């Protein structure tokens, strides 16, 4: 007698042959979680601000100086119809701004009632760090800088996590009058 298979038995046979001859899947690589922010430099230090805390990055705009304000308040600029106060972040923190104007950029911060532009020496764009390189153990910092640093990522050099929102809530930053 001939071996007659039912359609179901035929499908089971095909399934078994396919499973025997199928190549295995490639090994799964575990995805490394990363943290992203806007990298910038002030003096010889590297900083990174959380993505949600910087609205945009601008070239240093022309601004009008204001009387009766602290020296780190550079003035006010018209940016697309909005008046943007321009602040020298290095000056606020007690350091010198780089003399190389071409590299300077302005980080625009809008948080609660504060809308301000922070001049920094240089911006490096988006930076990505593996989360396991983060540490809350900070290197020695100036007292003026400490309230705004929330940790450090380690790469070739340390990248300090700078919070523009913490700066925007700091009374010393809000008090601009002489």
From Swiss-Prot:
Q: What role does this protein play?
A: May be a part of a signal-transduction system that regulates twitching motility by controlling pilus function (extension and retraction).
A Gene Ontology biological process in which this protein takes part is: signal transduction
Q: Which SUPFAM superfamilies match?
A: CheW-like (SSF50341)
- One GO cellular component term noted in the UniProt record for this chain: cytosol
Q: Where is the CheW-like domain?
A: 34-173
Query: What keywords sit in the KW lines?
Result: Sensory transduction
InterPro entries the record matches: CheW, CheW-like_dom_sf, CheW-lke_dom
Organism domain of life:
Bacteria
Protein's organism: Pseudomonas aeruginosa (strain ATCC 15692 / DSM 22644 / CIP 104116 / JCM 14847 / LMG 12228 / 1C / PRS 101 / PAO1)
Q: Looking at the Swiss-Prot or TrEMBL record, what is one Pfam family this protein matches?
A: CheW
| Protein name (record) | Protein PilI
